[in-house]
Amino acid sequence: MSTYLIGDVHGCYDELIALLAQVEFDPRRDTLWLTGDLVARGPGSLEVLRYVKSLGDSVRLVLGNHDLHLLAVFAGISRNKPKDRLKPLLEAPDADELLNWLRRQPLLQVDEEKKLVMAHAGITPQWDLETAQQCARDVEAVLSSDSYPFFLDAMYGDMPNHWSNELSGLARLRFISNAFTRMRYCFPNGQLDMYSKEAPEDAPAPLKPWFAIPGPVSNAYSIAFGHWASLEGRGTPEGIYALDTGCCWGGELTCLRWEDKQYFTQPSNRQKSLDEGEAVAS
């Protein structure tokens, strides 16, 4: 019985299936962890959701920012962007079933036995695990309720960018969703920077990757995350696993087998384009 952690799929269904075949994944005995951003950019978002949903208890996933954006499009709050290639999913006969399932998925996974935590973007160093779990529950409760469109309408924005237990209402929920699904860099005091996306060696001072600032969670648990393709899976401290390696941009899909920490990769079926970083079919 093995635990496989896979980075952002982004609708790259064929690569996901090929990678699972490579590691001989068997849902009857193995468990699959997914770092979020199941959808958008790749051609197979519909197939990815159908497959992942079919795995039932054999999969543990977290929501990413693209998953939340898809839910906002589904709710009529945001417009579908052609580059996200979501039209087949939104027009599918089982779209309601799939997306209502998706909005009931968590923002945080914790395995106490493995001392392993997973979130799409990571864990802000301002939180201990108890705070992170409570914050995740706060957003999950709203997303799974009938009032979820009100949150999705208010989630877009970069403020507040500093955690306080005094935060309340939609401002609190926006910080939580940004920390779990959009965070990359922090100031030394833990305040989020929502603008910089470059690789750490190119980031302006005094910004640091969130994982470079010691925090209560990273001191006690391993953390797996996706979201940050420009890291290319490198440059993180021991116990911090960056799993997004840019499959939808022409990179590869990466899998970590937890038990022996062995990595497996599946090359993208797409090639890198020089046109504004977009990927085109090969």
Curated annotation (Swiss-Prot):
Known catalytic reactions: P(1),P(4)-bis(5'-adenosyl) tetraphosphate + H2O = 2 ADP + 2 H(+)
Keyword flag Hydrolase: yes
Query: What intrachain disulfides are recorded?
Result: none
**Family matches, as NCBIfam families:** apaH (TIGR00668), PRK00166.1 (NF001204)
One Pfam annotation, family name?
Metallophos
**Key word Transcription present:** no
Please name the source species.
Answer: Klebsiella pneumoniae subsp. pneumoniae (strain ATCC 700721 / MGH 78578)
* Known role: Hydrolyzes diadenosine 5',5'''-P1,P4-tetraphosphate to yield ADP.
**HAMAP family in the record, alphabetically?**
ApaH
What protein name does the entry list? Answer: Bis(5'-nucleosyl)-tetraphosphatase, symmetrical
Q: Which UniProt keywords apply?
A: Hydrolase
